[in-house]
Amino acid sequence: MTIMRKSHPLMKIVNHAFIDLPTPPNISGWWNFGSLLGLCLILQIFTGLFLAMHYTSDTLTAFSSVTHICRDVNYGWLIRYLHANGASLFFMCLYIHIGRGIYYGSYLYMETWNIGILLLFLTMATAFMGYVLPWGQMSFWGATVITNLLSAMPYIGQDLVEWIWGGFSVDKATLTRFFALHFIMPFIITALVMVHLLFLHETGSNNPLGLPSDCGKVPFHPYYTTKDFMGVILLLTLFMTLVLFFPDKLGDPDNYTPANPLNTPPHIKPEWYFLFAYAILRSIPNKLGGVMALAFSILVLTLLPYLHTSKQRSLSFRPLSQTLFWMLISDVIALTWIGGQPVESPYIVIGQVASVLYFSIILIFMPIAGLIENKMLKL
């Protein structure tokens, strides 16, 4: 078998990626989330495939087909809730993965980091289109509000919105194309994940110290396969507890009402994993400004390699930057909370302050903290 995995063309690829891959000896549990994201992607593709076998992308029957899956299909309720809550699990792992990348300076691997940001955009687009498919109240109004934001673009905005809708409002054409795109996107994401891993394996993994670890690297198997397997068991235990005991905890009750274009819900909001960006969008009184702030809330991550001023890569030995990092995490949590609240005082002001703080920490305070820490090293 040893000869086979080192000589066979296909086995060689697997061997270099998952068995004999030289890995730093000191990477912590925060590095588990890459493999957990792979697990989430596989889970979403398989559950989505089985759901697509029974779903109909028609405005008259979409809601009924989801009900049919839950009531009449063998274990359909389980497949549906695995898929719906699997999206939440995916984003939880994704945000922790990005947070770890920021904390330990992994963004300095620029190709890997930028492909990761592209993956985040595609995953967000896929999740948004998936949320529209059950054709409940929040699905319909969420699709209407979010796609309508593109009309803020000068000159081409309204034409672009109508092109996406396939008509003059969100209707059958919109639902059909969203279903087609939602089905194909995970396979595009999978291809990009391969490229993400390719670039990562060119440089090797980062480690908590942010120092080169070439002299002490260990093979990925059995050390990190065992460690990743432990992470998988823990995560699946928590995930199955959520799916089997609290399947609707993260959903919106309005989505159990069929879509009605004549009745607007009192408070239109996306799923919890988009609320931080939604809060930033709402905090700008101008429509175009809000859309630009929404896009920049993710695009700002591409600037991190250029804003890195410290002589140290990781935040492990940088108390000032650590404080700012945890302030940023607290701010994102506050924005998530604000995004779920109605547009009224005091939530409007809190959202605006939190939005300004979000961009200030990333663009101003963290680069300044890096320069101050460089000065402190010379004392």
Curated annotation (Swiss-Prot):
Belongs to the cytochrome b family. It is found in: Mitochondrion inner membrane. One of its GO terms (molecular function) is ubiquinol-cytochrome-c reductase activity. Its main location: mitochondrion. GO terms for cellular component: mitochondrial inner membrane; respiratory chain complex III. InterPro entries: Cyt_b/b6_C, Cyt_b/b6_C_sf, Cyt_b/b6_N, Cytb/b6-like_sf, Cytochrome_b, Cytochrome_b_C_euk/bac, Cytochrome_b_N_euk/bac, Di-haem_cyt_TM. Heme 1 (or BL or b562) is low-potential and absorbs at about 562 nm, and heme 2 (or BH or b566) is high-potential and absorbs at about 566 nm. PROSITE patterns: CYTB_CTER, CYTB_NTER. A ubiquinone binds at H201. It is a multi-pass membrane protein. This is Cytochrome b. Component of the ubiquinol-cytochrome c reductase complex (complex III or cytochrome b-c1 complex) that is part of the mitochondrial respiratory chain. The b-c1 complex mediates electron transfer from ubiquinol to cytochrome c. Contributes to the generation of a proton gradient across the mitochondrial membrane that is then used for ATP synthesis. The keyword Membrane applies. The chain crosses the membrane at residues 33-53, 77-98, 113-133, 178-198, 226-246, 288-308, 320-340, 347-367. Heme b b566 binds at H97, H196. It comes from Cratogeomys goldmani goldmani (Pappogeomys goldmani goldmani). Pfam families: Cytochrom_B_C, Cytochrome_B. Its cofactor is heme b. GO terms for biological process: mitochondrial electron transport, ubiquinol to cytochrome c. Binds 2 heme b groups non-covalently. The cytochrome bc1 complex contains 11 subunits: 3 respiratory subunits (MT-CYB, CYC1 and UQCRFS1), 2 core proteins (UQCRC1 and UQCRC2) and 6 low-molecular weight proteins (UQCRH/QCR6, UQCRB/QCR7, UQCRQ/QCR8, UQCR10/QCR9, UQCR11/QCR10 and a cleavage product of UQCRFS1). This cytochrome bc1 complex then forms a dimer.
